[in-house]
From Swiss-Prot:
Protein name: Fatty acid oxidation complex subunit alpha
InterPro entries: 3-OHacyl-CoA_DH_CS (IPR006180), 3-OHacyl-CoA_DH_NAD-bd (IPR006176), 3HC_DH_C (IPR006108), 6-PGluconate_DH-like_C_sf (IPR008927), ClpP/crotonase-like_dom_sf (IPR029045), Enoyl-CoA_hyd/isom_CS (IPR018376), Enoyl-CoA_hydra/iso (IPR001753), FA_oxidation_alpha_subunit (IPR050136)
Location of the region described as 3-hydroxyacyl-CoA dehydrogenase in the Swiss-Prot/TrEMBL record: 311-729
Pathway: Lipid metabolism; fatty acid beta-oxidation
Region (Enoyl-CoA hydratase/isomerase): 1-189
Annotated binding of substrate, by residue: 296, 500, 660
Lineage summary: Bacteria, Pseudomonadati, Pseudomonadota, Gammaproteobacteria, Enterobacterales
Family of the protein in this entry: In the N-terminal section; belongs to the enoyl-CoA hydratase/isomerase family.
Active-site residue numbers: 450 (for 3-hydroxyacyl-coa dehydrogenase activity)
Length: 729
């Protein structure tokens, strides 16, 4: 053994060839600060070996290196800029020394080589991969850019266009694509990986392969003519501006850095990467996006822990076909859980099957599946007008009309047709689960399972625990949601549960603004372009359905009369009374016409202004700041109340439900992350300016208390230790 650290070791493999093996405790290798330091020490040992002829890097895990240790990021990002810059210089010196070894080097890459793992293998001369490879640089998705030389080496290896596509979009690619663009030199079966890598090394050692020529371009300026450079970088900047926009500074910073570094050799190019990385690491966007990643891991880990002792349902059923039922049936079947889809009429069943077939055909068109797979999946969805097969199902989700009487009748009837241990769930969006449970003989086997539309796209499923729902019931439904590829978040019961309970105060803020003379077009523009929502409130209401929102608004008002009962006729009432239900009938705040792809496209409709004039004061202008404050304060206040009342368990789960269920702008990180970034005291000052608008604007006492003590909702993160400590951590 030449060297042994906590996460890697170095040993002789055969005559003159050494192997450096990443083998961290636990299931995966991460390129954390300790591993970077250990890698530096191992390379120091290699530099002393006079009889070294070649080096092979490999992993003892199912994946090579999954990336940097993102759990370290928030504390690293708090390190002063100068210290963070110094540590990056140290880390890059490690990869430079790997790249500068006086012998050929190869990385035998299996599974994932992402982020820092990718940057590590870019420093070797050759890369041999297994067919399950996923390699790339996802840093821009975390609000940063490559910091270990990825933005320098990749463009010089692949050419600017391929590298820009991966780096700016935060993409990873599979083995075939990696081979095609030159990111790896070959692909072999896993059992032949090490032998194949050794064979390439021997060829390089013997002079059959010119490893020095392979290495040289990475040390030099990017080989691009002025015209080629102008075209590549202009197109890349245009694409980034269009897709990422102003709220995500990392992609455009990465492109501009690669452009600026193109005319320099490795050392100066790395300095430019360092100078760009450090300011990005100190942005609110980076903290928010890293926070989302960590919250996602937390939520999925919680679901895994919750389901460790239960069997995942093997057979499911959906009550109520149509678009929603068909979407749920498709998602279950697509992920390998056969499903019975029941409705009381043929038309709805046809609609449900058509929806599932349409989604499968899209997969076929994209080349994700073949005809055989399509037929196989669709054959596991069994449409029925009766209860045939219900005696074999493990879980049933009810997705009928949003009416408590209808839902109770359907659930009570179904309970008599299934096994005593079968779990029943309701896909209600607002009706309290404990109320629906009153119709059942076995309420402990019942809970809520709130999917979001469109089911195949929206990652969140709210799992609602009723007063009598058993732990086993919740665990089974969480297991099914996870199997469907969804992110399940368990919430406690109340009208609207979590997501709709906090959404409708947001809509109430919108209605009040319209009542006071604001233009819905400006509100939408501000909330989309300035705050960052994917849709403004008017457009969102049109998509949800004005009739649906009108009904839900009444349910919420009955559930929370003190805050959500209104004493005036609002815009939603006016549009509902005029039969303007949104996209579903082509008229809402906008008029909708189908484009060439059959998708609804919004157009101006002057008639809506006359309708709104009946429920609004004369038009007046509002500042962007006031619009954002009046829209967001009711939502954030309600989010805080949900945490205080135990409806949602943690700030992390609340923020993920908002991001995955409502499209809360990821660069804000969710309501609690936004609140922490703003500061509770500053938020309180802002909210107090609007408390005259009514109970929705009254800040909860718990939040006032946070403001008094200047406390955040997320645990306080301490800056990482000094750079000197990081080197030897």
């Amino acid at each position: 053994m030449l060297y042994k650290g906590d996460t890697l070791y170095l040993d002789w493999l055969e005559d003159g060839i050494a192997e450096l093996v990443f083998d961290a405790p636990g299931s995966v290798n991460k390129l954390d600060t300790a591993t970077v330091a250990s890698l530096g020490e191992a390379i120091g040992v290699l530099e002393q070996q006079s009889d070294l002829k070649g080096l092979l890097l490999r992993s003892n895990k199912a994946a090579f290196i999954v990336g940097a240790d993102i759990t370290e990021f928030l504390s690293l990002f708090l390190v002063p800029e100068e210290q963070l810059s110094q540590w990056l210089h140290f880390a890059n010196s490690v990869f430079n020394r790997l790249e500068d070894l006086p012998v050929p080097t190869i990385a035998a890459v299996n599974g994932y080589a992402l982020g820092g793992g990718c940057e590590c293998v870019l420093a070797t001369d050759y890369r041999l991969a297994t067919p399950d490879l996923r390699i790339g640089l996802p840093e821009t998705k975390l609000g940063i850019m490559p910091g270990f030389g990825g933005s320098v080496r990749m463009p010089r290896m692949l050419g600017a266009d391929s590298a820009l596509e991966i780096i700016a979009a935060g993409k990873d690619v599979g083995a075939d694509q990696a081979l095609k663009i030159g990111l790896v030199d070959g692909v072999v079966k896993a059992e032949k990986l090490v032998e194949g890598a050794k064979a390439i090394l021997r060829q390089a050692i013997n002079g059959d392969l010119d490893w020095k020529a392979k290495r040289q371009p990475k040390l030099e300026p990017l080989k691009l003519s002025k015209i080629e450079a102008t075209m590549s970088f202009t197109i890349a900047k245009g694409m980034v501006a269009q897709t990422a926009g102003k709220h995500y500074p990392a992609p455009i910073t990465a492109v501009k850095t690669i452009e600026a570094a193109a005319r320099f050799g490795r050392e100066e190019a790395l300095n430019l990467e360092n100078k760009s990385f450090v300011p990005l690491a100190h942005t609110n966007e980076a903290r928010a996006l890293v926070g989302i990643f960590l919250n996602d891991q937390y939520v999925k880990g919680k679901a895994k822990k919750l389901t460790k002792d239960v069997e995942t349902p093997k057979q499911a059923a959906v009550l109520g076909a149509g678009i929603m039922g068909g979407g749920i049936a498709y998602q279950s079947a697509w992920k390998g859980v056969p499903v019975v889809m029941k409705d009381i009429n043929d038309k709805s069943l046809t609609l449900g099957m058509t929806e599932a077939a349409k989604l499968l055909n899209k997969q076929l068109e994209r080349g994700k599946i073949d005809g055989l797979k399509l037929a196989g999946v669709i054959s596991t969805i069994h449409p029925t007008l009766d209860y045939a097969g219900f005696d074999r199902v493990d879980v049933v989700v009810e997705a009928v009309v949003e009416n408590p009487k209808v839902k109770k009748a359907v659930l009570a009837e179904t309970e008599q047709k299934v096994r005593p241990d079968t779990v029943l769930a309701s896909n209600t969006s607002t009706i309290p689960i404990s109320e629906l449970a009153n119709a059942l003989e076995r309420p402990e086997n019942f809970c809520g399972m709130h999917f979001f539309n469109p089911v195949h796209r929206m990652p969140l499923v709210e799992i609602i625990r009723g007063e009598k729902s058993s732990d086993e019931t919740i665990a089974k439904v969480v297991a099914w949601a996870s199997k469907m590829g969804k992110t399940p978040i368990v919430v406690n019961d109340c009208p609207g549960f979590f997501v709709n309970r906090v959404l409708f105060p947001y809509f109430a803020g919108f209605s009040q603004l319209l009542r006071d003379g604001a233009d819905f077009r400006k509100i939408d523009k501000v909330m989309e372009k300035q705050f960052g929502w994917p849709m403004g409130p008017a457009y969102l209401l049109d998509v949800v359905g004005i009739d649906t929102a009108h009904h839900a608004q009444a349910v919420m008002a009955a559930g929370f009369p003190q805050r959500m009962q209104k004493d005036y006729r609002d815009a939603i009432d006016a549009l509902f009374d005029a039969n303007r239900f949104g996209q579903k009938n082509g008229l809402g705040f906008w008029r909708y016409k189908e484009d060439s792809k059959g998708k609804p496209k919004k157009e101006e409709d002057a008639a809506v202004d006359d309708l709104l004039a009946e429920v609004s004061q004369p038009k007046r202008d509002f500042s962007e700041e006031e619009i954002i404050a009046r829209m967001m304060i009711p939502m954030v206040n309600e989010v805080v109340r949900c945490l205080e009342e135990g409806i949602i368990a943690t700030p992390a789960e609340a923020d993920m439900a908002l991001v995955y269920g409502l499209g809360f702008p990821p660069f804000h990180g969710g309501a609690f992350r936004w609140l922490d970034t703003l500061g509770s005291a500053k938020y309180l000052d802002m909210a107090q300016q609007y408390q005259h608008l009514g109970p929705l604007y009254e800040v909860p006492e718990g939040l006032r208390n946070k403001a008094r003590h200047n406390e955040p909702y997320y645990p306080q993160v301490e800056p990482a230790r000094a750079v000197g400590d990081l080197k030897t951590a």
